Amino acid sequence: MASFANPFAGNVPRKITKEELIQAIRLDIAGELEAIFVYDAHVQATDDPVAKTVLADIRDEEKAHVGELMTLLQYLDPDEAERFAEGQQEVKEMLEKLNISTKGTTKPNTTVGSLVKE
């Protein structure tokens, strides 16, 4: 949550390690996903067309942030990137077993952020 009362809340006594940065990026991703959920709930809860439009736009920007952070995480932790790719492949194989075509639905190595309409 916001800590505006403390002007030094963002100051840190040292640079973080790569491992700490990876953990921080994961936490950032969780925060972005939570923001997407909240903004989407607001969109669904109002009939005001201006509010719906603005909130949906903000929600979609958060989706792009997830994509940016996922890309950064994959850069910082190539092993984790391989596991993400393995998971994507497993789902593709399941879809094939169910005779569901994925051709033309997504680009290879897509992320949540890359699925946002441009």
State where each predicted segment sits.
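Iron-associated oxidoreductase/ferritin-like identity signal
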Residues: 1-118
